[in-house]
UniProtKB/Swiss-Prot annotation:
InterPro entries xrefs: Ribosomal_bS6, Ribosomal_bS6_CS, Ribosomal_bS6_sf, Ribosomal_S6_plastid/chlpt, Transl_elong_EF1B/ribsomal_bS6
Name of the protein described by the UniProt record: Small ribosomal subunit protein bS6
Cleaved signal peptide residues: none
Function: Binds together with bS18 to 16S ribosomal RNA.
CDD domains (alphabetical): bS6 (cd00473)
GO biological process, one term: translation
Region (Disordered): 113-137
Species this protein is from: Wolinella succinogenes (strain ATCC 29543 / DSM 1740 / CCUG 13145 / JCM 31913 / LMG 7466 / NCTC 11488 / FDC 602W) (Vibrio succinogenes)
Gene name of the encoded protein: rpsF
Gene Ontology CC terms, in alphabetical order: cytosolic small ribosomal subunit
Gene3D superfamilies, alphabetized: 3.30.70.60
Biased composition (Low complexity): 119-137
A GO molecular function held by the record: small ribosomal subunit rRNA binding
Amino acid sequence: MRHYETMFIVKPTLTPEEIVEKINFYKEAIIKNGGEICATQDMGMRNLAYEINKNKRGYYFVVYFKSAPSLVIELERLYRINEDILRFIVIKYESKKEQNAWNTMVDKVNKKAEAPKSAPVAAPETAPVAPEATPEA
């Protein structure tokens, strides 16, 4: 199995539920076609470098996965036929050096995803209550 990274940009006009639905669709497509998702990174809504189809913003999402080369062909086909995807890219990591870089990126993304969950929650501080002023006669 080869190492891949894909990033796609979803139209900003979709509702948050529709965006999650699109993301899950592509994650399921990777799994259904024999791929193994190693990490995902939700980059959120960002400004585009230039306007694409009259959109100045887009919702970015990155998936790191391992699969056979045939999956990439199917994934690109699914990206192309969906009008809600503004842009996409699939990057293949071939050499040992590139695969080590891929492993490092996957580790960073997984650590970043775990960090907020393990952080202790601080108790909110209460402001001191000021004594009420009594009216003078």
